[in-house]
């Protein structure tokens, strides 16, 4: 791939100034609060603080409990929380990246910390068909079913993407009051499809909208993703009233605030 080699050469300064530019773009296009899963301790939080924004920050947690740097990343997550504990605009989630980058033992350790210290969880979920097929092969369950089986949703959770969901997955998300962050432009750019928003709405799932990242979107202007959210489902369902402007406005405002509060 092309991304991993570039990520490996990224420095903390790169992360800070990239995040600061992102904050400037978000402010210019009307976003005042965001959540981000990052790689470098303190850099995104510092950029958000310097820009005067509100942010819910997550250190991306990848690996295993004692190996592959997993324990170190979890330690960094708590160090960062401590550094900003007195900052009223910066708060945190615990963020295992995905089920395919964290083993079961590591996920259970993160869940234990999240429940024990009342920290919300953030994870990429069912973004690709490959992720779902690998989960079925490895666990005999969809990613959503697997996370439910290990108690992940016992703590407040924000799940990004949620493109490839079964009806049972949607029932699980609704039952556990999981918030879903749809990222339509990113999902389309990467050829992954898009979240089944009308079905999620039918079951009362809290839906919000994200831009994912500049690398997979080319823009952090949330209004673009709001527009796509409304248009995609009208076209696919051949129904002009499907996913109305009023509903999309709520996704981008109140629902997003509920997911991060």
Where are these regions (language model features)?
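Divalent metal-coordination and catalytic microenvironments
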Residues: 30, 48, 94, 124, ...
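A structural motif
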Residues: 29-31, 53, 118-120, 177-178
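Metal-coordinating catalytic core of metallo-dependent amide/deamination hydrolases
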Residues: 43-163
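Alpha-helical scaffold segments that flank or form the walls of functional sites
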Residues: 1-52, 74-86
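A conserved active-site cap/scaffold subdomain adjacent to cofactor or substrate pockets
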Residues: 167-168, 174-205, 209-211
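Structural detector of well-ordered beta-strand residues that form the stable sheet scaffold
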Residues: 34-35, 56, 122, 158-160, ...
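Histidine/acidic-residue-rich catalytic or RNA/ligand-binding cores of hydrolases
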Residues: 129-141, 169-174, 191-200, 217-234
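His/Asp/Glu-enriched, well-ordered alpha-helical/loop segment
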Residues: 149-156, 198-261
């Amino acid at each position: 791939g092309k991304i991993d080699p570039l990520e490996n050469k990224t420095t903390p300064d790169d992360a800070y100034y990239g995040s600061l530019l992102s904050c400037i773009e978000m402010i210019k296009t009307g976003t005042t609060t965001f959540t981000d899963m990052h790689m470098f301790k303190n850099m995104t939080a510092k950029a958000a603080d310097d820009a005067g924004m509100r942010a819910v920050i997550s250190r991306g947690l990848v690996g295993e409990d004692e190996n592959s740097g997993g324990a170190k990343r979890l330690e960094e997550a708590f160090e960062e929380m401590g550094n900003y504990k007195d900052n009223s605009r910066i708060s945190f989630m615990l963020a295992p990246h995905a089920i395919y980058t964290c083993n079961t033992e590591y996920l259970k350790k993160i869940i234990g910390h999240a429940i024990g210290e009342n920290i919300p969880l953030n994870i990429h979920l069912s973004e690709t068909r490959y992720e779902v097929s690998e989960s079925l092969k490895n666990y005999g369950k969809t990613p959503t079913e697997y996370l439910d089986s290990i108690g992940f949703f016992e703590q407040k959770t924000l799940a990004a993407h949620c493109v490839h969901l079964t009806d049972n997955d949607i029932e699980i998300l609704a039952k556990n009051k999981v918030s879903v962050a749809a990222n339509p432009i990113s999902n389309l750019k990467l050829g992954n499809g898009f979240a089944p928003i009308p079905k999620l709405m039918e079951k009362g799932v809290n839906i919000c909208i994200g831009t994912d990242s500049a690398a997979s979107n080319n823009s952090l202007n949330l209004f673009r993703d709001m527009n796509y959210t409304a248009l995609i489902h009208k076209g696919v369902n051949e129904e002009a009233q499907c996913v109305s402007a009023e509903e999309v406005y709520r996704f981008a405002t109140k629902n997003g605030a509920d997911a991060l509060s």
